UniProtKB/Swiss-Prot annotation:
PANTHER family: 50S/60S RIBOSOMAL PROTEIN L16, LARGE RIBOSOMAL SUBUNIT PROTEIN UL16M. Binds 23S rRNA and is also seen to make contacts with the A and possibly P site tRNAs. This is Large ribosomal subunit protein uL16. GO terms for molecular function: rRNA binding; structural constituent of ribosome; tRNA binding. It comes from Anaeromyxobacter sp. (strain K). Belongs to the universal ribosomal protein uL16 family.
Length: 138
């Protein structure tokens, strides 16, 4: 599972997801990309499940880049615990996704294979996505 090796602070505030992504919204390496069209949070398990779906479909062909990393800790209190007594323990890490963010990039495959692979991956993700190609306006 993806998570930071070490962090400056153990816990983080909840925050809000507003606006759209300006950084990470263009294709950097691949010919095709999977771009988020709404905001949300991706856990390391969801990122890994989508990666496995893509790599299993394209098999040995193509190169895949993961463009997001879960660096925000999410805390949770134990069940049947009274309120108060501080913030809960870190349970998992998430990547905060804004609309326009490219999640995955793919190269070395044809158009139909990339579309099908990203379609399979999109079913594993909690945010709406679309496929983008290099050269088209994003």
């Amino acid at each position: 599972m993806l998570q930071p090796a070490r962090t400056k602070y153990r816990k983080m505030q909840k925050g809000r997801m507003r606006g759209k992504a300006y950084r990470g919204s263009d294709l950097a390496q691949g010919e095709y990309g999977l771009q988020a069209t709404e905001c949300g949070r991706l856990t390391s398990r969801q990122i890994e499940a989508a990666r496995v779906a893509i790599t299993r479909y394209v098999k040995r062909g193509g190169k895949l880049w993961i463009r997001v990393f879960p660096d925000k800790p999410i805390t949770k209190k134990p069940a049947e615990t009274r309120m108060g007594t501080g913030k809960g323990n870190v349970e998992f890490y998430v990547a905060v996704i804004k609309p326009g963010r490219v999640l995955y990039e793919l190269a070395g495959v044809d158009d139909a294979s990339a579309k099908k692979a990203f379609h399979l991956a999109a079913h594993k993700l909690p945010v709406a996505t679309k496929m983008v190609k290099r050269g088209e306006t994003l």
